[in-house]
Amino acid sequence: MADIIPNISIDVALFGFKGIKLEVLLIKRDKKPEMDQWSLPGGYVYMDESIKDAAKRRLKELTGITKLYLSQIALFGDTNRYPTRRLVSVLFCALIKPEQFKLIAGSDAKDVEWFKVSELGKLPFDHNEMISTAMLWFKNEIWREPIFINLLPEKFPLNQMQNLFTQFLGEAIDNRNFRKKVISQELVEKLNEKTKGGQQRPAFLYKLKRTI
C-alpha cells in the first residue's frame, strides 16, 4: 500500500433529488474520532494518486458509488478543524439521481444513507460548513451551467424543476418569471403529455433539451 500524504485529505458532498427535497449522502463513521457519527465521505490521499482520484477512490470504498464527475470547489484549512492534528481538506461535490446507484457501505463506514439537507443536525468537524459551501457553489452556477441535468427525471412538470431550483437558491421563485426564464434560455422542451393522477390539475410535462 502506498504511503499517504500527511496532513491532506478529501471530502465529498454528494447531492441527490428524489422529486421533493434535496438530500446529501452521509456515512456512519466506523473509526475515531467521531465514531458512530454521520459525516461526509472522505479520507486521505496516497502519494501515487491525484487529489481527484483519491476522492473517487474513497467514494467507492465508503459508499460503492463509482463513475462520477466530481467538481473540486473549496479548500478547508482552519487550524482547529480536526481534533488530533493539523489537517487540510479538499472539498469535491457532485449531483446524482439516487435511484441509479446502489449504496454499499465499506471500508471504515458502518452505514451509508441519504439525509434531507433541510433537516440536517450538527455534523462532525466542519462538514456543515462544507455542505453550505457546496450549496452556495451550486447556487452561483445554477443559471450558468445546467448542473441540474443529473437530478431531474426524463420527463417532469415545470413545478418540479422550480422546486429544485428553489432549494439551491434558498428563496422562493415567482412562477411566471421562472417559466419565462427557462423557456427563453431554451433549457427545456414542452411535450404533448400531461401529468396523471394526484389531486392537482394535470400539468404539461417537459424534458431537458438534448443540446444541454
Task: Give the role of each language-model region.
Residues 163-172:
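Short helix-coil junctions and helix-kink-helix linkers
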Residues 2-10, 53-56, 62-102, 141-148, ...:
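Active-site segment of metal-dependent pyrophosphate-handling enzymes
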Residues 9, 25-27, 33, 40-51, ...:
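Active-site-proximal cofactor/substrate-binding loop regions of enzyme domains
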Residues 93, 103-138, 151-159, 177-186:
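NUDIX/MutT-family hydrolases
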Residues 145-154, 168:
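Conserved helix-adjacent loop modules within structured domains
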Residues 1-38:
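N-terminal strand-loop-strand
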Residues 191-212:
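Long, intrinsically disordered, low-complexity Ser/Thr/Pro-rich regulatory/activation regions
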